[in-house]
Amino acid sequence: MKLTHLDEKDRPKMVDVSDKEQTTRVAVASGIIEMSQDAYDAIVTQKTKKGPVLQTAVIAAIMGSKKTSELIPMCHPINLSGINCDVEELPELPGFKLSVTAKLTGQTGVEMEALTGTSIGLLTIYDMVKAIDKGMVIRNIQLEEKAGGKSGDFKR
């Protein structure tokens, strides 16, 4: 398989998608942050000094998805039609699972937007409670599923 982000002289390029058909594309990504019981309790009881952690993480995830093309050089700037972020409490870890769904009708996929949003949301949680627990671990940031586009559907 030839990498599409390299030209015939192996120089980086952004892929030309102008000839691609516009289709509806959806991607879901997720990741987990593990933390101490003290950090978890501070978040769920909303007793952190920096404010409502999970609500802020949701907003950050949405913002991160929208900024993907500014952070990842070969990503196209796209007009996302929808972004949704869900946070699930995982008291057994303790920690949280954050999931981002990105959607558009366009000529390129939204996997990177979902993955970037997930990463930024989790990093925001870390930032807001690092005073309580610097040993938090962010893990398993992954594409869960995608639909639409030439490469077909994917489900983990």
Swiss-Prot record:
Q: Does the keyword Oxidoreductase apply?
A: no
Residues involved in substrate binding:
M74, C75, H76, M112, E113
Quaternary structure, from the entry: Homohexamer; trimer of dimers.
- Top-rank lineage group of the source organism: Bacteria
| Enzyme Commission number, as recorded | 4.6.1.17
NCBIfam families from the entry?
moaC (TIGR00581), PRK09364.1 (NF006870)
Pathway note = Cofactor biosynthesis; molybdopterin biosynthesis
Name recorded for this polypeptide:
Cyclic pyranopterin monophosphate synthase
Q: Which InterPro entries has this protein been placed in?
A: MoaC, MoaC_bact/euk, MoaC_sf, Mopterin_CF_biosynth-C_dom
Q: Which UniProt keywords apply?
A: Lyase, Molybdenum cofactor biosynthesis
Report the catalytic activity.
(8S)-3',8-cyclo-7,8-dihydroguanosine 5'-triphosphate = cyclic pyranopterin phosphate + diphosphate
What Gene3D superfamilies does the record point to? Molybdopterin cofactor biosynthesis C (MoaC) domain
Species this protein is from: Sulfurimonas denitrificans (strain ATCC 33889 / DSM 1251) (Thiomicrospira denitrificans (strain ATCC 33889 / DSM 1251))
Q: Which residues form the active site?
A: D127
Q: Which family does it belong to?
A: Belongs to the MoaC family.
Q: Its biological function?
A: Catalyzes the conversion of (8S)-3',8-cyclo-7,8-dihydroguanosine 5'-triphosphate to cyclic pyranopterin monophosphate (cPMP).
